[in-house]
A protein has these predicted regions:
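Bacterial N-terminal signal peptides that target proteins for export
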Residues: 1-8
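Sec-dependent N-terminal signal peptides of Gram-positive bacterial secreted proteins and lipoproteins
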Residues: 12-15
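Conserved functional acidic sites
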Residues: 21-250
Length: 250
């Protein structure tokens, strides 16, 4: 299980009006791909959506017992921005460890529009690969993408999606990213009032989504978001493994 956007499948200031999104592969995108060109962004790096707040300096730590060992993910909101498709986005660093060894280091880009929707605009990815003795042998960048570009040379242009809607309602279905053949994560809102209990005994009332992608048709994930905190848990449907929030700072 890979946790990110954040937990994806193994997430200048001033008034900005977005220009047209380039066509994807010469065809139209599905209806579930949000219309980025119709959004406006007055303060895009001020991300205060209650289910996906990004306050600079906040760090979330998640853990999961997996078949491969202990997985730990550290998510940090950086005091950095990046311009994507003419919009400034907030940079979120996500580091994933397996048995205390760094296996992935990403920088995700998010922006909030004037309606309160949080957009996912892409990510830089460093994947760390080791030999059986634990020696680093290569760093790859599989999974990297940027809205408005074709970074993998696939002949298509990536489009941004919603990582969290402003007013989510059960049944809402939307793409979180749309880069044909490379990144096509989708989500559907299942419920707004699901109570979950973490291993440490903490209870949260959560927004629940079911995440999926046609690139991995046999996999479904449930994610749970608490107001004022963000993501608190993720699980693969049919698996006993669950990624859980263990700390949030400050």
């Amino acid at each position: 299980m890979r946790v990110a956007a954040w937990f994806a499948f193994c997430a200048g200031f001033g008034l900005t009006m977005v220009g047209c999104v380039p066509p994807v592969g010469g065809g139209s995108a599905p209806d579930t791909v949000p219309d980025f060109a119709a959004a406006s962004f007055a303060n895009p790096t001020e991300v205060d959506n209650p289910y996906f707040p990004l306050v600079v300096g906040t760090t979330w730590t998640y853990e999961a017992e997996t078949a491969d060992g202990m997985e730990r993910v550290v998510v940090e909101v950086l005091d950095e921005t990046r311009e994507v498709m003419g919009v400034q986005s907030r940079v979120v660093r996500v580091r994933e460890y397996l048995n205390d060894v760094l296996v992935e280091d990403t920088r995700d880009w998010h922006a909030q529009d004037d309606d309160g929707n949080v957009w996912y605009l892409g990510e830089e990815v460093d994947n760390y690969n080791y030999d059986p003795a634990g020696n680093l042998i290569e760093i790859t960048h599989e999974g990297a993408w940027e809205a408005g570009k074709d970074v993998a040379g696939l002949g298509v242009i990536a489009r941004p999606g919603h990582i969290m809607k402003a007013s989510p309602a059960p049944g809402d279905t939307y793409h979180q990213e749309y880069y044909v053949g490379e990144a096509e994560d989708e989500a559907v809102v299942v419920a707004l009032d699901v109570v979950i209990t973490l291993s440490n005994g903490t209870n949260y009332t959560c927004l629940q989504t079911r995440d999926f992608t046609r690139l991995e048709p046999g996999i479904r994930e449930h994610k749970y978001y608490a107001i004022g905190i963000g993501l608190v848990a993720e699980e693969v449907v049919g698996s006993t493994e669950r990624v859980e929030l263990v700390s949030i700072e400050p």
